[in-house]
């Protein structure tokens, strides 16, 4: 008779006396077998048939377990006395096993019994009539006392409501671990423990499987060491990464990465034996880390320009700074015996953290990393409790877990540890032909963390999909298995719309092209082969310039760029070219060469040095009389470097005597033509008007910059009285122009600076010696370059004004030296713009670009070795070039952005740092030495040792610098593409390195001591390499954030904590999605029709707009949950002003709302290219739908109102300067255009209304309300932006009144008068008269120029102001038909 049945788990320690037993009528908890139980039937059916039918009672025969021998004898005596008919049988302790007996006679409570319950294990019980009590164990009573628990554990008497709960509980007694993690082979007793283990250790792998990529071989069979398990079967189809093995009691089972199924200790012994058999010497571990507190030695000037960052990654490029320090490895004394590691929820085999290699030599040498693999992880707290997980699964009504169907056959590489050369060749062929691949990149040094093997796949949804399934899957109608993306990121796919939006992105290919390897570079090609398998791209077309211009003209200078100055590149790429993780070997190696050599080394760089030190945007129109040499073919001779150095020399018409071939006024540039052709005369007149506008706008902004400079420096400066021979600015208190550093007045007050900004520290980046070496390296005269004090001032401006918004460079880690001085030049270039020295910025940009071209020339053959500071310098140069007023430079940004993105992927900067180098924390967990107090305390001290914390700090800064650089590229590339409609995005699905850390202060720390103090303050413990990895990667993967935007994952929403910088990146990803959907709508429409904006807009509204709305709602919830603010109020202004990310997010968010209504890329592209006539035409075409225009105007007015709130708050703080971020300025400019266009539509209705015509349309009530709202917001803006005592600028106002004297009335309307005019009961003629007289369309454009003038920093604002002025002239001179 089997021992398990209801009621058989009663305490067996029989200590009651006979008298006590006799007094118990029906129920004695300690022994149910000896007495007549009127409410139970016997367990044995034989006794049911022979029961005494008169009394309806029976004798129950049950086997009891005893620990004490005399108790067994006593129980046997009573059994024979009271129940002579029963043959009681007892088992000895050795036959029982580990049985818990710790209950007494009060362990049960009688409660009403349900009408019937069924025990599906052994026997069925039926309740006799009239009886209704069941026992509830005391242990279960503390949970619920009003619910029967009929399923009792035979070992510990714990009761359960459901049988499956009892089965799950019994695994703790039987030591059964039926659930296997497919990645590492770890076995667990419960399925939720496997899920928690995979979320912690294999988070990058969970969900990466795609049924369309993984196609198991039909004839292959599994080889999971059959002797270790009874049966293997596929678990529930929702669990792609869990295998259930019935009856398994092993801790670890074989996997493709650990075919032997051994623990870390066993693997170490196998490695030693293998090394001895092959006569290979294993490396000796480093000595024990010193526990004493020691000062970090002074860092040497690294070749990369940063402070000490160096890790043991031989053969892998380190993308930050280097030093002589190498990560030490703790050496445990051999005499110390390590206890067997505990079975943790998230521990894994050491083999999981090693990358495979086909070479036997590397297979052996790589085993030295086994001792660094984790033995136990201390942060195994689940993201979802087991109860929550099981409740979520039970709500889905999933089918029961069975072992009926075996899993699909999988081919495993059995030659992983085979030293046979033939086996190795077979393995290489198998890897080349197999279409299944991992999405984690193997590094060259074989230290990739958690590299998976081949694992099972199912066509059904995963458990995460089922738990997050809801009614709207980002507007697509829920989960669709046929188009399911591994990361639910198909909606961010940048493929062409051949199928639905849930196509796989390019990062997850359907087929992998095979690549052959050679014996000479087998090891590097093996690493590249795995990397190559990540992308389904064919080799990209090489970039070739299309007639790169040799001369560039703008309003401040005439420049003939030298090689690499502006990086003008017109790439001839295929339309379906995708940006994915690209294997450097698979790319045409000419793309970087053509980017480097896109201009002539012999070309010259010209600038007007009469105004070299002038404040503001100096106006100098292009001259037809300028002598500019023609472009020469590239010269690769030995003298080419001399030409490169001479390209910046003032000897090429850059004399210091003030002579120039540029006119100083527009009247000298253009004269009336002598011919009488009316067409030519009209064209010349338009050209003259355009030059006049450039001249007026330049004077306006230069005057504004000069006024701001006076406020900042507290001195009177006049551009017309600058000593051109000295070519230095006169600062108060400065006696020596070559002084090392001059302290400027603080540009930004403390209340405006972010609390996350870099702490003020006297760090001098430029010295006289460094400046002299830079001048000699570039062959520049000292007078044609900013002074040392000016360069350091520009660095200060960069720290205070630009870095808080775009903190992708860790400033405290920079070491000034000649190796990385282009980065210093690019930093000072941005600071020069904030110091209103645009000419200095142009010189610095040219020098930095020239040196970057030389650096790229060195790594031309191996772009994967590109260093981090090179890419960061290119990013800063891209900021300068994109927001430049030079159209030729802007046209070349497509090629420059494309090159940066390819360099990112070639250098694997978009991948986690742990895939390239090992974290510096030792893997031996502290619990390994719990039985040795001495070693236990020693290991604890090592974790907090100064040397170890310094290594952790360096690793953290390096990882975060890489992550933030990628996010900066994502930000600028997608926003620029969204503005101009170009396809040069760094796609969100390719960003896999992580997110900015939640605590921004950790990244801004200047040294490891400050960093350690903050860790203690935030209670962050780094006791394993995985805790450091998690912290360095921002504690979240960006793919999970994108999945939330797509699915609204409630699990992510409830558990994730992301920074505001991550929210900004997610908002940019939504902009990317809008661009993709807009392009898809155009492509879908253009298949059958010509370009038609109205048809494209209809396609957009029918297929894409709902998805964008859903994503924006999800983003809003996440942003508000993490402390964000969307609507500025008087109480929230201080919070918004203290967080630079919020100041960027609010306008960018409202800009996304506008883009969902109107496709503004057509208009902004024309403005960037200064095509004013086509700009006016495109704006009318885009705003054809009054409903969409009305909705976009709502968001535009909210943006202007938010800016006014910011400005008012700063003004109340007695601050006269409010520097708007460049992205916010761009969004504000677009908002002003939209508001003006809507007001122009209303004014056109007013002018065209005919009261005598009964068919004339009336003004809608919504339009009345919106017009009144616009009038109120613009009046508030005017009152705060233009003080009453200040006169309006005559240059702009007079120019408009020259066109139409009634075009602009700057007097503010009375609020009561405006409300009365918009009242529907008011006479329509009064309403029309007020609308026409107010002329809000022209007033809005004028105030827009004033907004741009408040922060005249980036040169692009000249183009923006010119566009607003051109639109104003167009609006007052052209009579338009009514569109309402």
UniProtKB/Swiss-Prot annotation:
Organism: Saccharomyces cerevisiae (strain ATCC 204508 / S288c)
Protein name listed in UniProt: Respiration factor 2
Molecular functions per Gene Ontology: DNA-binding transcription factor activity, RNA polymerase II-specific; RNA polymerase II cis-regulatory region sequence-specific DNA binding; sequence-specific DNA binding; zinc ion binding
SMART domains assigned to the protein according to its UniProt record, in alphabetical order: ZnF_C2H2
InterPro entries: Transcription_factor_dom_fun, VerF-like, Znf_C2H2_sf, Znf_C2H2_type
CDD domains per record: fungal_TF_MHR (cd12148)
Positions of modified residues (Phosphoserine): 231, 322, 544, 632
Role description: Transcription factor that regulates expression of both nuclear and mitochondrial genes, and more specifically those required for glycerol-based growth and respiration.
This protein's encoding gene: RSF2
Keyword S-adenosyl-L-methionine: no
GO biological process, one term: DNA-templated transcription
Disulfide bonds: none
Principal place of residence: nucleus
Organism superkingdom: Eukaryota
Cell location: Nucleus
């Amino acid at each position: 008779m089997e021992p398990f049945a209801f009621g058989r788990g009663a305490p067996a320690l029989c200590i009651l006396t006979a008298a006590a037993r006799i007094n118990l009528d029906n129920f004695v908890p300690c022994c149910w077998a000896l007495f007549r139980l009127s409410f139970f039937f016997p367990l044995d059916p034989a006794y049911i048939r022979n029961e005494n039918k008169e009394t309806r009672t029976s004798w129950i025969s049950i086997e009891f377990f005893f620990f004490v021998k005399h108790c067994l004898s006593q129980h046997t005596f009573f059994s024979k006395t009271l129940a002579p008919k029963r043959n009681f049988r007892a088992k000895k302790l050795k036959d029982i096993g580990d049985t818990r007996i710790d209950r007494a006679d009060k362990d049960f409570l009688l409660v009403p019994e349900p009408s019937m319950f069924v025990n599906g294990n052994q026997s069925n019980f039926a309740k006799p009539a009239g009886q209704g009590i069941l026992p509830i164990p005391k242990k279960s009573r503390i949970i619920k006392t009003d619910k029967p628990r009929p399923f009792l554990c035979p070992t510990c008497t714990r009761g359960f409501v459901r049988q499956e709960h009892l089965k799950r509980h019994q695994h703790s007694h039987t030591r059964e671990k039926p659930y296997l993690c497919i990645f590492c082979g770890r076995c667990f007793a419960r399925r939720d423990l496997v899920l928690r283990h995979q979320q912690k250790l294999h988070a990058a792998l969970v969900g990466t499987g795609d049924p369309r990529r993984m196609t198991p071989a039909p004839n292959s069979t599994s080889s999971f060491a059959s002797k270790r398990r009874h049966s293997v079967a596929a678990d529930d189809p929702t669990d792609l990464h869990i295998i259930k093995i019935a009856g398994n009691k092993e801790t670890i089972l074989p996997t493709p990465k650990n075919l032997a199924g051994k623990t870390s200790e066993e693997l170490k012994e196998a490695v030693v034996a293998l090394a001895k058999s092959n006569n290979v010497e294993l490396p000796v571990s480093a000595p024990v880390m010193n526990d004493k507190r020691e000062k970090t030695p002074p860092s040497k000037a690294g070749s990369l320009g940063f402070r000490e960052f160096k890790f043991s990654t031989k053969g892998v490029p380190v993308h930050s700074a280097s030093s002589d320090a190498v990560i030490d490895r703790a050496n445990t004394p051999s005499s110390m015996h390590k206890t067997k590691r505990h079975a943790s929820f998230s521990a894994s085999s050491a083999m999981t953290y090693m990358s495979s290699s086909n070479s036997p030599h590397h297979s052996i040498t790589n085993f030295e990393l086994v001792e660094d693999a984790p033995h136990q992880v201390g942060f195994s707290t689940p993201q979802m409790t087991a109860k929550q997980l099981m409740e979520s699964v039970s709500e889905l009504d999933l089918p029961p877990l069975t072992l009926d169907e075996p899993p699909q056959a999988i081919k495993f590489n059995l030659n992983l540890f085979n030293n046979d050369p033939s086996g190795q060749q077979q393995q290489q062929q198998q890897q080349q032909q197999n279409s299944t691949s991992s999405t984690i990149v193997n590094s060259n040094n074989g230290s990739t963390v958690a590299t998976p093997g081949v694992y099972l796949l199912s066509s059904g949804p995963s458990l995460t999909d089922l738990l997050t399934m809801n009614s709207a899957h980002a507007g697509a109608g829920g989960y669709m298995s046929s188009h399911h993306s591994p990361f639910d990121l198909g909606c961010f796919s940048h493929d062409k719309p051949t199928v639905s939006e849930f196509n796989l992105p390019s990062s997850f290919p359907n087929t992998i092209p095979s690549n052959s390897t050679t014996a000479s570079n087998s090891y590097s090609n093996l690493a590249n082969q795995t990397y190559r398998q990540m992308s389904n791209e064919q080799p990209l077309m090489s970039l070739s310039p299309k007639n790169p211009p040799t001369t560039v003209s703008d309003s401040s200078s005439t420049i003939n760029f030298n090689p690499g100055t502006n990086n003008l590149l017109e790439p001839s790429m295929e339309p379906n070219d995708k940006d994915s993780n690209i294997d450097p070997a698979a790319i045409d190696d000419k793309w970087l060469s053509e980017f480097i050599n896109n201009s002539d080394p012999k070309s010259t760089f010209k600038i007007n040095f009469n105004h070299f030190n002038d404040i503001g945007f100096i106006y100098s129109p292009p001259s037809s009389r300028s002598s500019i040499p023609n472009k020469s073919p590239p010269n690769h001779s030995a003298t080419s470097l001399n030409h490169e150095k001479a390209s910046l020399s003032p000897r090429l018409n850059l004399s210091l005597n003030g002579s120039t071939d540029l006119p100083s006024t527009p009247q000298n540039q253009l004269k009336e033509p002598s011919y009488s052709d009316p067409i030519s005369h009209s064209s010349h007149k338009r050209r003259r008007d355009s030059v006049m506008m450039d001249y007026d706008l330049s004077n306006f902004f230069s005057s504004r910059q000069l006024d701001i400079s006076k406020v900042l420096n507290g001195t009177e400066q006049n551009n017309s009285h600058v000593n051109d021979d000295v070519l230095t600015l006169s600062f108060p208190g400065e006696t020596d122009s070559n002084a090392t550093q001059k302290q400027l007045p603080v540009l930004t007050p403390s209340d405006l600076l972010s609390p996350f900004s870099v702490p003020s520290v006297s760090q001098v980046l430029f010295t006289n010696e460094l400046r002299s070496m830079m001048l000699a390296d570039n062959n520049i005269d000292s007078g044609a370059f900013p002074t040392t004090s000016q360069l350091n001032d520009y660095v200060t401006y960069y720290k205070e004004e630009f870095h808080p918004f775009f903190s992708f460079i860790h400033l405290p880690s920079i070491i000034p030296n000649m190796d990385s001085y282009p980065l210093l030049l690019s930093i000072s270039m941005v600071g020069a713009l904030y110091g209103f020295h645009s000419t200095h910025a142009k010189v610095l940009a040219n020098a930095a670009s020239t040196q970057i071209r030389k650096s790229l020339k060195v790594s031309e053959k191996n772009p994967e070795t590109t260093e981090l500071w090179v890419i960061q310098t290119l990013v800063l140069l891209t900021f300068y070039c994109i927001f430049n007023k030079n159209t030729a430079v802007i046209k070349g940004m497509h090629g420059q952005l494309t090159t940066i993105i390819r360099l990112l992927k070639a250098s694997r900067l978009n991948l986690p740092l742990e895939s390239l180098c090992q974290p510096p924390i030792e893997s031996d967990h502290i619990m390994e030495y719990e039985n040795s107090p001495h070693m236990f305390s020693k290991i604890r001290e090592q974790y907090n040792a100064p040397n170890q914390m310094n290594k952790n700090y360096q690793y953290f800064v390096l990882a975060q610098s890489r992550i933030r650089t990628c996010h900066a590229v994502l930000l600028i590339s997608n926003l620029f593409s969204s503005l101009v409609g170009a396809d040069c995005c760094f796609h969100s699905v390719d960003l896999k390195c992580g997110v900015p850390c939640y605590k921004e202060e950790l990244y801004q720390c200047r040294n490891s001591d400050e960093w350690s103090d903050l860790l203690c303050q935030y209670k962050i413990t780094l006791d394993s390499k995985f805790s450091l990895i998690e912290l360095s990667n921002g504690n979240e993967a960006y793919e999970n954030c994108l999945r939330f935007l797509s699915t609204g994952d409630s699990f992510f929403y409830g558990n994730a904590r992301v920074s505001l910088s991550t929210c900004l990146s997610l908002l940019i990803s939504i902009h990317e999605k809008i661009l993709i959907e807009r392009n898809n709508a155009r492509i879908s429409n253009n298949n059958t029709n010509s370009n038609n904006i109205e048809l494209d807009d209809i396609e957009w509204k029918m297929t894409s707009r709902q998805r964008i709305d859903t994503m924006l709602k999800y983003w809003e919830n996440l942003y508000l949950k993490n402390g964000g603010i969307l609507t500025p109020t008087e109480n929230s202004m201080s919070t918004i002003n203290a967080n630079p990310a919020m100041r960027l997010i609010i306008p960018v968010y409202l800009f996304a709302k506008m883009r969902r209504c109107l496709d503004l890329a057509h208009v902004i592209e024309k403005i960037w290219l200064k095509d004013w006539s086509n700009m006016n035409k495109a704006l009318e075409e885009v705003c054809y739908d009054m409903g969409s225009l009305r909705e976009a105007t709502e968001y535009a007015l909210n943006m202007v109102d938010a800016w006014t709130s910011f400005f008012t708050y700063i003004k109340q703080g007695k601050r006269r300067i409010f520097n708007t971020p460049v992205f916010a300025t761009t969004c504000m400019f677009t908002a002003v255009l939209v508001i003006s266009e809507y007001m122009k539509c209303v004014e056109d209705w007013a002018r065209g209304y005919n009261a005598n015509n009964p068919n004339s349309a009336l003004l809608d009530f919504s339009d009345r309300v919106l017009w009144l709202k616009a009038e109120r917001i613009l009046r508030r803006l005017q009152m705060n932006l233009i003080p009453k005592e200040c006169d309006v600028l005559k240059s702009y106002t007079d120019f408009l009144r020259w066109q139409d004297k009634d075009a602009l009335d700057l007097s503010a309307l009375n609020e009561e008068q405006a409300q009365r005019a918009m009242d529907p009961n008011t006479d329509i003629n009064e309403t029309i008269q007020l609308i026409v007289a107010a002329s809000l369309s022209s007033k809005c454009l004028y105030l827009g120029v004033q907004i741009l003038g408040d922060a005249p920093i980036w040169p692009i604002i000249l183009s923006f102001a010119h566009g607003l002025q051109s639109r104003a002239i167009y609006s007052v001179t052209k009579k338009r038909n009514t569109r309402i």
